[in-house]
Curated annotation (Swiss-Prot):
Belongs to the RNA polymerase beta chain family. This is DNA-directed RNA polymerase subunit beta. It comes from the Bacteria. InterPro entries: DNA-dir_RNA_pol_bsu_ext_1_sf (IPR042107), DNA-dir_RNA_pol_bsu_external_1 (IPR019462), DNA-dir_RNA_pol_su2 (IPR015712), DNA-dir_RNAP_su2_dom (IPR007120), DNA-dir_RNAP_su2_hyb_sf (IPR037033), RNA_pol_bsu_bac (IPR010243), RNA_pol_bsu_CS (IPR007121), RNA_pol_bsu_protrusion (IPR007644). Keywords: DNA-directed RNA polymerase, Nucleotidyltransferase, Transcription, Transferase. DNA-dependent RNA polymerase catalyzes the transcription of DNA into RNA using the four ribonucleoside triphosphates as substrates. GO terms for cellular component: DNA-directed RNA polymerase complex. CDD domains: RNA_pol_B_RPB2. The RNAP catalytic core consists of 2 alpha, 1 beta, 1 beta' and 1 omega subunit. When a sigma factor is associated with the core the holoenzyme is formed, which can initiate transcription. Gene3D superfamilies: 2.40.50.100, 2.40.50.150, 3.90.1100.10, 6.10.140.1670, DNA-directed RNA polymerase, beta subunit, external 1 domain, DNA-directed RNA polymerase, subunit 2, domain 6, RNA polymerase alpha subunit dimerisation domain, RNA polymerase Rpb2, domain 2. One of its GO terms (molecular function) is ribonucleoside binding.
Length: 1357
C-alpha cells in the first residue's frame, strides 16, 4: 500500500477487521456538485444541459408581447470573472461573485403579413446582476462573511395517500385522503367525509364534492359511473328479471331463492349466504343467467338512463335509486334491459355514486362556476373567467409544474410503467388518483408513510438558487411584456427592455437573508464540514418547529446509511436538523442514496451500487460485518439482514446486497468517536455535537485513540494546504510554500511553479484563530494531494480537536462533584488548552450633517499617556498590547452649536476658540478585553486622501505580491536555463557571446557567461539555435505576463474602496486575545462526558503513580454508570497502552538501539496484534527512524466505529507496553503522601475545550444603560445589563421581612430616576443615604390606563 507524505511520518495502528471496499467519498461533494450543476460555468452554448440557470431562463423565455408582434428569446449566457479573489472579498467585506451576461434576441414580426413574417432581429448581451460563486470549500462569501447554504429535506412532489388515524370523527372511523403536491402550483386534495362521500379541496380552501371537479373536466354523470363501476345487466321477462351472472359478484350475498344448475340440482338454498365454495360450483356448472324476482333490483342504482323504447322519454336518470314507482313505469313501458351499478359493502363501495347524488351541479359550466366561487368568493363569475381560472390552476405550465421528480413519483404511485411525462396534470391523472383513493377505501392498497425517505427529497444549494432566480425572472417578465409593445414602434434594443434589478434582488435576498443561508459555523474543521453536510427540514416550503410532531423527528428505518440517527441538535430542533451519513449522496431526483456491494448466490462481489430508499426496499441486505470465507462467500447458516425496512435473518442464498462499511450508518462527526458502539445513544449525540464546539488549541495534538476518519476530515475540510500537483519543495517559510512542479505534470507553456500562500492568524466566524503551519522542508518530494501545511486543529494532516490528557477516574476531595473537572496546574503551564481568539473592531468615519468625522491623533481632553500607542495618523501600532478602555483609533466628530453652555459661549466669544467644536468618538477596546494588535486595515473612499498608514499598508501588500511574482519568475528562469544547459553542453558553437567558431560548450563556459549572454550564442545545429530563440521568447513572455499581473493587482489595491453611502473611511483593528484554561471553562470528552473546570491544583498536590508521574485530570467515576457511555473507559485503557508504547520506543531511540530492533518492535505493534497489517518493509531505515521519532509521544491507534479494538486486543497492547492489563494503578495522594485504598483507572483520554468560556460569560454591572420607556436597567452582557430581580425573588424578600433591601431593589436600584441620581451624588460625596421616590413603572402604568380611555390621576398630599 502506498503511504502519503504525512502518513509515512506517523502511521496510525488500525484495529479494523473488515476490508475497505470503498473509500469515504469527498465530504463536500453535496455542496460543490449541486452548485456546479447550477452554474454550468465551463459549458459552451451546445453543451448546456437543461438544469440550473439554463433551465430557469428556458422556462421564462421566450417572452411574447401582449399583441404577439414582438418576442424576446433567450440565446445563452456567460459568466464573467470575479473582481476580487476570496481572501480580498473577506477583507473588503464584499460578495465573492461574478457578473452574469445573458445573450437575448429581440424579434419583431410584421403586423401586416398574414403568416407573421419576421421584420427585424436584434441580438445583444444584457447584464443580469451578479451571481455569488462558491469557494472551493463549499461556502459563499456574502458581504465579507462566509456563509453556508444548508440543504433542505422537503416532501417530494407527487401524489400521497393518507388517513387521519381516526382523529377527525368521534367514532374513530378512518377517513382516507389523497393529496397531489406539485413542485410549484396549487395543491389538490381529495378526502372522504364520515358519510363516505368524496370531496375535493384546492389549496386547502372550502371543500366541494369531488364530482364537481370531474364535471368541470368535462365528464358526464354516465362517464363518471362508467369509469368507477362495473354494471349488472338485467333483462326484463314479464313479471321477473333475468340477471347476466358473474358468479364472483354474488359472494357474501344471501340467496333470495334456490339457485339450480341446468339439471335442476340445487347449488345454493334460499336464505343461505353464498360462499367461495358455492361460487366455485356455480362457475363449474357454467350458469350464465339467473332468474330473480322484480323487487331484487329495488334500492339498486341505475348505471345508465332508462328510456321509454317508444317515446324516448327518460323514465329514470342515471345514478337514480330504483323504487317501486319507477319499476311500475318500467313494466308499463315494456323496457327490456336495465343496467345497475355493482356495489357491495366489502370491496366495492358506492362512494362516487353517493357523491354524485349530493352534487348540486349538473353540467360543466355550473361546475366551473362553483369552483370559481370557491376560489374567488364575492366576485361575479363569467363563463370566460371561470374557464380561465380553472385551466390556470392545474393545466398551464406557467402556473403549475409537477417537475420531473413529481411526475416520476406520481406515475409510480398510481401504477404506471413510464416515469416521464408532462409537468401539468391531465384529466386521466385526476381520475386515476380518485380511483386509487377509492381502491384504498375499498381495502385494496395501503396508505403512504410520509416520513419514508422515498417520499422526502433533498433540495441542495443549486436547486434553491435556481428557484430564487426563476422568481426574479418572472418579475422581470411582467415588466418586459409591457415594454415589448413599445419596442415594436420605438426600435428599442434588448438592453432597454430588461431591468435586471428584480433578478439581482431575488438572488441577493436568498443568499443574504434566507433561513437556509446560515453564518458558517467555523469553530473548527469538523464544524465546517458538518455544517455543509447538514440537512434541515425547516425553512421556506418546509416544516415549522411548532407544527412538527414526533413522527417527523423520529429515526425511520430508511435513514439507514442516508441520514445519521445520532447527530441532531438537542432542544426544539431535535430530529428536524440532521446530518448526512458518511457515504450518502443524492441521486438525479434529489433522493438520498446509500452504497451497497452486490451479492450473487451468497458470493460477495466488489461491485458497488447506490440505491435510494425506494429501490432498496425489495432487496435483502446483509450487514457489513457478516462473516465471509477467503473466497468472499457468506458462511453463516442464517445471516442478519434488512428486508422491507425490517431487521430479520435469512439464508445466505437469499441475500442480494451487503453494506459497504460499518460506518455507513453514521455521520462524519459520529464516526470520529472511538468505541462509539459502547456508548449510549443520547451521550453519543452529545459527543457528536460537542466535538463541533471544540476551540482549536495553540498546539494541536493528534488523538492517541482515533477512528481513522481524522485524516479524511482534515483533508476534505479545506483548512490544510493540499498539493495541487506533485513536485519538489523549492522554498518554504512560515507564510508560503513554493513547489517546483514535476516535469510530467507541467502543461506546455505554463510556469511549472505552484505558490501556496498560507493563512496566518486570521479571524474565523466564531472569532477563533485560523493559522496554517508548513509541514514540508526544502527539497522534499511531494505527490499530488499530499498535505503540505496544517491548518487550525490539524496535526500532520489529521484532525486534532483537543489534547491527550492523563486522567484518573476517582472521587477526590469533592473537587469533581457533579461532573466538575479537577485539572493540574501543569496543563496551564504547558499551554495545553491555551487558545487564541481574534476580535475585529471597526471604526467608521462618516460624513455628518455638521461636517466630516476625522480620524486623527489630535483628540480633545485626552492625555498623552492614552495616545502613546497611536501613530501620527491616529491608528494603533501593530504589536501594541492593549487593555480595556485603550484608544485604538482616534476619531473626532463635529459637535452641534446647540450643546454649548453659557460659560463656553463666553470663552468662545473672548478667545475665538474652535477646539471644542468636536467631540471624542474614538474606537476603544471593549470592557473585559485585553490583547495584542496583530493587524490593521484601512479602507478609504474614492476621492478621499489616503493617510500615511494606508499608504504603508498598501506598500507592504505590493511588496508581498512582487515577491511572489519574482519567485515564480526565478523558478521559471532557473528551469528554462537548466533545460538549455542540458541541451547545449557537449555541442559546438558557431560563435557569438565571445566564443570562437567550433568551440565546444562545457559547464565552465556556460558558468562564465551571464544568463542574458546565453541567447547570443550561435550553435552549429539549427535545432539548438531554434531552441535558444524559443527559450528567449518564452522568458520575455513570462516576464511580461508577470508584470501585467502585478500591474493588475496594483491597480486593484490603489483604486478607492466601494464603501456604503456616507462613509469616508473604515479602519479595522484585529486583536489577538490569549485565553488560558481557568475554572469555569467547559470541557468535554468525545463520549458526551462534559463538565466544568472546578479547580486548578498545583502539580505536587495531584495524585501520582509509583514512578511519580502525576495525573493531569481527575474525573468523577460516578459520571459513567448512569450515563452508560463506557466508550470513555475503553478509550482511557487503549490511550494508556498507546502512550506506554510511545515511551518504550522513546527509550529505544534514546539508547540508540539498532534500526533492526526498532523495526521488529514496530512490526510487533502494527502487525502482530489484530487489525490491519502495515507494510513496514517498504520503509527505508531513515524512514523507520523518522517514524519512530514521531511515535515517541505515543503510538496513535485507530478503532473505527462498529469495527474497533476488542477487549483482548486492548489487553495485548497493554501487555506489550509492559503495563498492567487491568489498566489500573496504585496512586498516591500528592497532598498527604498516602496511597489510595484501591487501584484507580488511569489512562489517556482525548479532552476538548469547548467554546463556552467563562471570560465570555462572566459579567457584572455597576451603573449602565436604562430602557427608554420603563427606565429599568437593561439585561444581558452585550448591553452591560443587570440581573433581573423577578417576581419570585420579591416574594423571598417579603417572606424574610427584608423591607429596606426590598425598597431599594424596587426603587433606587431600578427605575426611580431622581432617587438613583441623587444617591449617586451622595455616594460620590461619601454620604451613604438614599431617598426612594416614585418608580417610573408606576407612571408607565398610569399612562397605559389612560390609553384605555380611563382618566386616572395620582393625588399627592
Amino acid at each position: 500500500m502506498a503511504y502519503s507524505y504525512t502518513e509515512k511520518k506517523r502511521i496510525r495502528k488500525d484495529f479494523s477487521k473488515l476490508p475497505d471496499v470503498m473509500d469515504v467519498p469527498y465530504l463536500l461533494a453535496i455542496q460543490l456538485d449541486s452548485y456546479r450543476e447550477f452554474l454550468q460555468a465551463g459549458a459552451t452554448k451546445d453543451q448546456f444541459r437543461d438544469v440550473g440557470l439554463h433551465a430557469a431562463f428556458k422556462s421564462v423565455f421566450p417572452i411574447i408581447s401582449y399583441s404577439g408582434n414582438a418576442a424576446l428569446e433567450y440565446v445563452g449566457y456567460r459568466l464573467g470573472e470575479p473582481a476580487f479573489d476570496v481572501k480580498e472579498c473577506v477583507l473588503r467585506g464584499v460578495t465573492y461573485a461574478v457578473p452574469l451576461r445573458v445573450k437575448v434576441r429581440l424579434i419583431i414580426f410584421d403586423k401586416e403579413s398574414s403568416n407573421k413574417a419576421i421584420k427585424d432581429i436584434k441580438e445583444q448581451e444584457v447584464y443580469m446582476g451578479e451571481i455569488p460563486l462558491m469557494t472551493e470549500n463549499g461556502t459563499f462569501v456574502i458581504n465579507g462573511t462566509e456563509r453556508v447554504i444548508v440543504s433542505q429535506l422537503h416532501r417530494s412532489p407527487g401524489v400521497f395517500f393518507d388517513h387521519d388515524r381516526g382523529k377527525t370523527h368521534s367514532s374513530g372511523k378512518l377517513l382516507y385522503s389523497a393529496r397531489i403536491i406539485p413542485y410549484r402550483g396549487s395543491w389538490l386534495d381529495f378526502e372522504f367525509d364520515p358519510k363516505d362521500c368524496v370531496f375535493v379541496r384546492i389549496d386547502r380552501r372550502r371543500k366541494l364534492p369531488a364530482s364537481v371537479l370531474l364535471r368541470a373536466l368535462g365528464y358526464t354523470t354516465e362517464e363518471v359511473l362508467d369509469a368507477f363501476y362495473t354494471t349488472n345487466v338485467f333483462h326484463v321477462k314479464g313479471e321477473s328479471l333475468s340477471l347476466e351472472l358473474v358468479p364472483q359478484r354474488l359472494r357474501g350475498e344471501i340467496a333470495v331463492l334456490d339457485i339450480q344448475d341446468d339439471k335442476g340440482k340445487v347449488i345454493v338454498e334460499q336464505g343461505r349466504r353464498i360462499t367461495a365454495r358455492h361460487i366455485n360450483q356455480l362457475e363449474k356448472a357454467g350458469i350464465k343467467e339467473l332468474d330473480v324476482p322484480l323487487d331484487y333490483v329495488l334500492g339498486r342504482t341505475t348505471a345508465k338512463a332508462i328510456v321509454h323504447p317508444a317515446t324516448g322519454e327518460i323514465l329514470a336518470e342515471c345514478n337514480t335509486e330504483l323504487n317501486t314507482e319507477i319499476l311500475a313505469k318500467i313494466a308499463k313501458a315494456q323496457v327490456v334491459r336495465i343496467e345497475t351499478l355493482y356495489t357491495n359493502d366489502i370491496d366495492c363501495g358506492p362512494f362516487v355514486s353517493d357523491t354524485l347524488k349530493i352534487d348540486s351541479t349538473s353540467n360543466q359550466l355550473e361546475a366551473l362556476v362553483e369552483i370559481y366561487r370557491m376560489m374567488r368568493p364575492g366576485e361575479p363569475p363569467t363563463k370566460d373567467a371561470a374557464e380561465t381560472l380553472f385551466n390556470n390552476l392545474f393545466f398551464s405550465p406557467e402556473r403549475y409544474d409537477l417537475s420531473a421528480v413529481g411526475r416520476m413519483k406520481f406515475n409510480r404511485r398510481i401504477g404506471r410503467t413510464e416515469i416521464e411525462g408532462s409537468g401539468v396534470l391531465c384529466k386521466e391523472d385526476i381520475v386515476a388518483v380518485l380511483k386509487t383513493l377509492v381502491d384504498i377505501r375499498n381495502g385494496k392498497g395501503i396508505v403512504d408513510d410520509i416520513d419514508h425517505l422515498g417520499n422526502r427529497r433533498v433540495r441542495c444549494v443549486g436547486e434553491m438558487a435556481e428557484n430564487q432566480f426563476r422568481v426574479g425572472l418572472v418579475r422581470v417578465e411582467r415588466a418586459v411584456k409591457e415594454r415589448l409593445s413599445m419596442a415594436e414602434s420605438e426600435g428599442l434594443m434588448p438592453q432597454d427592455l430588461i431591468n435586471a434589478k428584480p433578478v439581482a434582488a431575488a438572488v441577493k435576498e436568498f443568499f443574504g437573508s434566507s433561513q437556509l443561508s446560515q453564518f458558517m459555523d467555523q469553530n473548527n474543521p469538523l464544524s465546517e464540514i458538518t455544517h455543509k453536510r447538514r440537512v434541515s427540514a425547516l425553512g421556506p416550503g418546509g416544516l415549522t418547529r411548532e407544527r412538527a410532531g414526533f413522527e417527523v423527528r423520529d429515526v425511520h428505518p430508511t435513514h439507514y446509511g442516508r441520514v445519521c440517527p445520532i447527530e441532531t441538535p438537542e432542544g426544539p430542533n431535535i430530529g428536524l436538523i440532521n446530518s448526512l451519513a458518511a457515504y450518502a449522496r443524492t441521486n438525479q431526483y434529489g433522493f438520498l442514496e446509500s452504497p451497497y456491494r452486490v451479492v450473487k448466490d451468497a458470493l460477495v462481489t466488489d461491485e458497488i451500487v447506490f440505491l435510494s430508499a425506494i429501490e432498496e426496499a425489495d432487496h435483502v441486505i446483509a450487514q457489513a460485518s457478516a462473516t465471509m470465507n477467503d473466497k468472499g462467500q457468506l458462511v453463516d447458516e442464517l445471516v442478519a439482514v434488512r428486508h422491507l425496512n425490517e431487521f430479520t435473518v435469512k439464508a445466505p442464498e437469499d441475500v442480494t446486497l451487503m453494506d459497504v462499511s460499518p460506518k455507513q450508518v453514521v455521520s462524519v462527526a459520529a464516526s470520529l468517536i472511538p468505541f462509539l458502539e459502547h456508548d449510549d445513544a443520547n451521550r453519543a449525540l452529545m459527543g457528536s455535537n460537542m466535538q463541533r464546539q471544540a476551540v482549536p488549541t495553540l498546539r494541536a495534538d493528534k488523538p492517541l485513540v482515533g477512528t481513522g476518519m481524522e485524516r479524511n476530515v482534515a483533508r476534505d475540510s479545506g483548512v490544510c494546504v493540499v498539493a495541487r500537483r506533485g513536485g519538489v519543495i523549492d522554498s518554504v517559510d512560515a507564510s508560503r510554500i513554493v513547489v517546483r512542479v514535476a516535469d510530467d505534470e507541467v502543461e506546455t507553456g505554463e510556469a511549472g511553479v505552484d505558490i501556496y500562500n498560507l493563512t496566518k492568524y486570521t479571524r474565523s466566524n466564531q472569532n477563533t484563530c485560523i493559522n496554517q503551519r508548513p509541514l514540508v522542508s526544502k527539497g522534499d518530494r511531494v505527490q499530488r494531494s499530499d498535505i503540505m501545511a496544517d491548518g487550525p486543529s490539524t496535526d500532520m494532516g489529521e484532525l486534532a480537536l483537543g489534547q491527550n490528557m492523563r486522567i484518573a477516574f476517582m472521587a477526590w476531595n469533592g473537587f469533581n462533584f457533579e461532573d466538575s473537572i479537577c485539572l493540574s496546574e501543569r496543563v496551564v503551564q504547558e499551554d495545553r488548552f491555551t487558545t487564541i481568539h481574534i476580535q475585529e473592531l471597526t471604526c467608521v468615519a462618516r460624513d455628518t450633517k455638521l461636517g466630516p468625522e476625522e480620524i486623527t491623533a489630535d483628540i480633545p481632553n485626552v492625555g498623552e499617556a492614552a495616545l502613546n500607542k497611536l501613530d501620527e495618523a491616529g491608528i494603533v501600532y501593530v504589536g501594541a498590547e492593549v487593555g480595556a478602555g485603550d484608544i485604538l483609533v482616534g476619531k473626532v466628530t463635529p459637535k452641534g452649536e446647540t450643546q454649548l453652555t453659557p460659560e463656553e459661549k463666553l470663552l468662545r466669544a473672548i478667545f475665538g476658540e474652535k477646539a471644542s467644536d468636536v467631540k471624542d468618538t474614538s474606537l476603544r477596546v471593549p470592557t473585559g478585553t485585553k490583547g495584542t494588535v496583530i493587524d490593521v486595515q484601512v479602507f478609504t473612499r474614492d476621492g478621499v486622501e489616503r493617510d500615511a498608514r494606508a499608504l504603508s499598508i498598501e506598500k507592504s501588500q505590493l511588496d508581498e505580491i512582487r515577491k511572489d511574482l519574482n519567485e515564480e519568475f526565478r523558478i521559471v528562469e532557473g528551469a528554462t536555463f537548466e533545460r538549455l544547459r542540458s541541451a547545449l553542453v557537449g555541442h559546438k558553437a558557431e560563435g557569438g557571446a565571445g566564443l570562437k567558431k567550433g568551440q565546444e560548450i562545457t559547464d565552465e563556459v556556460l558558468d562564465g557567461l551571464e544568463h542574458g549572454q546565453w541567447f547570443k550564442l550561435r550553435m552549429a545545429e539549427d535545432a539548438l539555435n531554434e531552441q535558444l530563440e524559443k527559450a528567449q521568447a518564452y522568458i520575455v513572455d513570462r516576464r511580461r505576463l508577470l508584470d501585467d499581473k502585478f500591474e493588475d493587482k496594483k491597480r486593484k489595491l490603489q483604486q478607492g474602496d466601494d464603501l456604503a453611502p456616507g462613509v469616508l473611511k473604515i479602519v479595522k483593528v484585529y486583536l489577538a486575545i490569549r485565553r488560558r484554561i481557568q475554572p469555569g471553562d467547559k470541557m468535554a470528552g468525545r463520549h458526551g462526558n462534559k463538565g466544568v473546570v472546578s479547580v486548578i491544583m498545583p502539580v505536587e498536590d495531584m495524585p501520582h503513580d509509583a514512578n511519580g508521574t502525576p495525573v493531569d485530570v481527575v474525573l468523577n467515576p460516578l459520571g459513567v454508570p448512569s450515563r452508560m457511555n463506557v466508550g470513555q473507559i475503553l478509550e482511557t485503557h487503549l490511550g494508556l497502552a498507546a502512550k506506554g508504547l510511545g515511551e518504550k520506543i522513546n527509550r529505544m531511540v534514546e539508547e540508540q538501539r539498532k534500526v533492526a530492533e526498532l523495526r521488529t518492535f514496530l512490526d510487533e505493534i502494527y502487525n502482530q496484534i489484530g487489525g490491519r497489517n502495515e507494510d513496514l518493509d517498504s520503509f527505508s531505515d531513515q524512514e523507520i527512524l523518522d517514524l519512530a521519532n514521531n511515535l515517541r509521544g505515543g503510538v496513535p491507534m485507530a478503532t473505527p466505529v462498529f469495527d474497533g479494538a476488542k477487549e483482548s486486543e486492548i489487553k495485548a497492547m497493554l501487555k506489550l507496553a509492559d503495563l498492567p492489563e487491568s489498566g489500573q494503578m496504585q496512586l498516591t495522594d500528592g497532598r498527604t503522601g498516602n496511597k489510595f485504598e484501591r487501584p484507580v483507572t488511569v489512562g489517556y483520554m482525548y479532552m476538548l475545550k469547548l467554546n463556552h468560556l467563562v471570560d465570555d460569560k462572566m459579567h457584572a454591572r455597576s451603573t449602565g444603560s436604562y430602557s427608554l420607556v420603563t427606565q429599568q436597567p437593561l439585561g444581558g452582557k452585550a448591553q452591560f445589563g443587570g440581573q433581573r430581580f423577578g417576581e419570585m425573588e420579591v416574594w423571598a424578600l417579603e417572606a424574610y421581612g427584608a423591607a429596606y433591601t426590598l425598597q431599594e431593589m424596587l426603587t433606587v436600584k431600578s427605575d426611580d430616576v431622581n432617587g438613583r441620581t441623587k444617591m449617586y451624588k451622595n455616594i460620590v460625596d461619601g454620604d451613604h443615604r438614599m431617598e426612594p421616590g416614585m418608580p417610573e413603572s408606576f407612571n408607565v402604568l398610569i399612562k397605559e390606563i389612560r390609553s384605555l380611555g380611563i382618566d386616572i390621576d395620582l393625588e399627592t398630599e
